[in-house]
């Protein structure tokens, strides 16, 4: 059996095989392993709920898991305290140890699932973004997927503990923020407010979410984005930029200072292999890879 995809959080891991089988291990206090119990496992165990299904993608948050199966069905399991597994408003629950279908995507084809902290997101083939879970910047929680109403055609999404970053046509936009100001501050402007609207009836005006453009990259085209718990990384065609919390050295700047706007990271011989680089973030670290 060949494992094609893994998704790791601090205390639990998931593995998806080439045959669409899902295996999980680690902490299961909130049912985030989807095994129907709350027992933790120190070896991978198959999630039997999906035994007759084909799992295509997985995403792990702090205490919850999302799974996309063939047929464009999205499942959530684990902690539901902030709505991160898409539980119905009429059926509040603190956790769920068996996968449940998340409603609210209509006939959209889902091509990407994302999770971090208590946040969840799904990207459609048309570049539309749905978000749910803990509200950003003090907004109320979303207990069901909410469509981000925007003219942007989003191609990449990454989530932090308190912020989200999206990439559209080489430009970066931010949702939310936190005390270290991941990609915000005086260098962020919002010439167009891209609002989110609920995918199920909702009348609360205060629930409007907005994307803000990150405009401090001197016109450079961004090709990849990544987010850790409280920091972010942007890979342009010529440079790597990091910003946010720096207490563990995760910004790669030779210090542990926090940064409120993107800083260029010095990578030796950058220009000789810039087109083959990839960038990824863990909770408190950043990795730059070079492909063959």
Identify the role of each PLM range:
Residues 1-2, 23, 27-42, 75-96, ...:
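Short glycine/serine- and acidic-residue-enriched loop/turn motifs that recur at repeat junctions
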Residues 1-42, 47-49, 57-59, 67, ...:
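WD40 beta-propeller repeat fold
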Residues 4, 12, 45, 56, ...:
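Structural signature of WD-repeat beta-propeller blades
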Residues 6, 48-50, 102-105, 146-150, ...:
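Surface loop/turn motifs at the tips and blade-to-blade linkers of beta-strand repeat domains
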Residues 9, 42, 53, 60-61, ...:
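Loop/turn position at the start of each blade in beta-propeller repeats
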Residues 12-15, 24, 64-67, 76, ...:
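Conserved core positions of repeat-based scaffolds
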Residues 217-249:
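Loop/turn-rich, solvent-exposed surfaces of beta-rich toroidal or solenoidal domains
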């Amino acid at each position: 059996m060949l494992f094609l995809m893994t998704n790791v959080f601090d205390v639990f891991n998931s593995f998806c095989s080439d045959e669409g089988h899902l295996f999980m291990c680690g902490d299961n206090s909130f049912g985030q392993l989807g095994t129907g119990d709350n027992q933790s496992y120190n070896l991978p165990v198959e999630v039997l709920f999906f035994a007759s299904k084909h799992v295509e993608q997985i995403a792990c948050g702090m205490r919850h898991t999302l799974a996309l199966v063939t047929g464009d069905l999205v499942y959530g399991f684990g902690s539901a305290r902030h709505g991160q597994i898409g539980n119905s408003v009429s059926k509040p629950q603190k956790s769920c140890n068996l996968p449940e279908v998340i409603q609210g995507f209509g006939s959209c084809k889902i091509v990407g699932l994302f999770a971090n902290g208590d946040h969840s997101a799904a990207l459609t083939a048309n570049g539309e973004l749905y978000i749910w879970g803990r509200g950003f910047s003090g907004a109320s929680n979303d207990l069901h997927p909410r469509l981000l109403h925007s003219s942007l055609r989003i191609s990449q999404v990454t989530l932090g503990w308190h912020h989200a970053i999206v990439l559209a046509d080489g430009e970066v936009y931010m949702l939310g923020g936190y005390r270290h100001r991941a990609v915000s501050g005086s260098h962020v402007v919002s010439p167009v407010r891209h609002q989110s609207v609920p995918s199920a009836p909702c009348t609360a005006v205060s629930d409007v979410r907005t994307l803000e453009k990150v405009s401090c990259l001197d016109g450079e085209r961004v090709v990849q984005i990544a987010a850790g718990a409280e920091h972010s990384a942007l890979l342009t065609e010529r440079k790597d930029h990091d910003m946010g919390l720096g207490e563990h050295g995760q910004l790669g700047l030779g210090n542990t200072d926090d940064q409120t706007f993107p800083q260029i990271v010095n990578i030796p011989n950058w220009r000789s292999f810039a087109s083959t680089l990839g960038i990824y973030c863990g909770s408190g670290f950043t990795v730059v890879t070079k492909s063959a």
